[in-house]
A protein has these predicted regions:
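Active-site-adjacent substrate/metal-binding segments within catalytic domains
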Residues: 7, 14-124, 130-155, 161-165
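Polar, glycine-rich mid-to-C-terminal structural blocks
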Residues: 167-178
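Single conserved hydrophobic/aromatic residue that forms the stacking wall/gate
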Residues: 1-10
């Protein structure tokens, strides 16, 4: 993964040409596509990074501790470096966990680890209307805005095991029996 990062500084000028505010952010610029096209076996599913096909090797990442404040910077660094040393280039943030803190994404940017970011909706059926749907929409907006400058974010995904539960785990049958 291309690890080049840039710093962008935005400054706000008042009418008298004095700077009134500024903000500096690290940003990563890259092109990433998920290639899904027909082939002899059905359909492809691979990552193309800056025009080059990439074999995604990685792991499913869950929260490191039930008590989140116990996860130290050293533990985050060790986790990401362990992934790098295992020749991984992608981690999937499990939708039953949490949106990780900024350090996690900063380290992934630094070490070239792509992130398959689940939205935090897993293993259940969720209402798809009204206030709950608006809450989901706002959660997506807030987290995409928060993480959008990280080059490590490869894709956003949702609905972890929700359809599987309905169609394959007997949820549909149990629901209709009630």
């Amino acid at each position: 993964c291309d690890r080049r990062q840039r710093q962008m500084c935005i400054r706000d000028r008042s009418i008298n040409e004095r700077f009134t505010d500024s903000q500096t952010e690290k940003i990563g610029i890259r092109s990433l596509k998920i290639i899904n096209k027909p082939d002899k076996d059905g359909k492809t599913f691979y990552v193309e990074l800056n025009g080059q096909p990439v074999f995604a090797k990685g792991a499913n990442y869950i929260p490191q501790d039930n008590f989140l404040p116990r996860v130290t910077e050293e533990r985050y660094r060790k986790t990401i470096l362990d992934a790098v040393n295992a020749n991984m280039n992608m981690l999937r943030i499990w939708g039953g966990g949490i949106y990780e803190n900024d350090l996690f994404y900063d380290l992934c940017d630094q070490y070239g680890i792509l992130v398959w970011q689940d939205f935090m909706f897993a293993c259940s059926l969720y209402p798809a209307e009204g206030e709950f749907l608006e809450n989901i929409r706002q959660e997506a907006i807030d987290n995409i805005k928060r993480l959008r400058n990280h080059a490590c974010i490869a894709l956003w995904c949702g609905n972890n095991e929700c359809n599987d539960a309905w169609f394959n785990w007997g949820w549909q049958r149990r629901y209709t029996q009630q």
